[in-house]
Amino acid sequence: MAVFVREAVSHNHFKLLQELYGRDLGGERFLHWKHLLDPHCGAPMEKTGIFYKDQERYLGMFVSSFYPFKINKLYFNVNMLGDLGIHRQVKSSTVLKDFFLQAKRSDVAADICFSDDRKIRVYEKIFRKYLTTNTQIYPFVELTLKPDKFMAFRFTEGGQARQASFINNLGREKDHRAFEYIEKHPLYHKIHYINKGNLYAVIGCSSECAELLDISNPSRECFSWAIGVCRHLHSRCKVMIPTGFYKSICAQAAEVIAEKRINMLIGYYSEKISELMPKEVWVCRMDRR
């Protein structure tokens, strides 16, 4: 009989994730960075692997991470849910719901997860029926494009970026731990801190593209500027934007190479938090689990 168990996430679970998803999720080094180098999850209570097992065989996996988040001057704790995978041989219709119930915590103001258009609606139904009726879906689109113009900028240091004012940016504190963590990301060979006036951005460069990892203000102006800066660093730029900016950003691109819909679902346990959450929210690469 299959049961739910809790274990610390380890390298041993990399092959399990590959099997459950049927594809590589960034490589073993990425899993190591994502879960084992995470500076805010050093204790078992802060990051928990929830597994569905039949004797010694793993049939499903879910990861719950406890994070201190902030947006503008609002501080609160969240339960970030990710790496959900269920083996195709599992026929029970309740396992998905039970994973979310197993991950529920009483010490957070919100549950957060990311997924595509189809799955996010299923997850929201589970949230509203079993966790909280106070939910919100924030739709984004991840674009890979060729910028059509160069924008002026200057290189700066992570220390200066930490002093910048990050507006409507949901995630962990932009302190030295956060920037040291992003610099260890295995997919980028160089991390650049850039600014122009009061605009700041963090860009990661790989052989494939320059990716916008963090931005001080998720406005059209700031996105357009950061994308133009990426043009100096690579012919291709990858960026996640709110879907409301889709047409205007695509109009400024020489070519849109790829796009992928991503949604952030938040289930609130505090009315104060949900009421103060701005309509235009952005989440940096570090905090997208």
For each feature predicted by the language model, list its residue ranges.
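Amide-forming acyltransferase catalytic core, primarily the GNAT-like/NAT-type
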Residues: 3-8, 12-56, 61, 68, ...
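Catalytic micro-motifs at enzyme active sites that drive phosphoryl/nucleotidyl and oxygen chemistry
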Residues: 38, 66-72, 97-100
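Short beta-strand micro-motifs in enzyme catalytic cores
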Residues: 46-50, 75-77, 192, 263-266
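Secondary-structure boundary elements
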Residues: 55-56, 104-109
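A broadly used, surface-exposed interaction patch
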Residues: 61-83
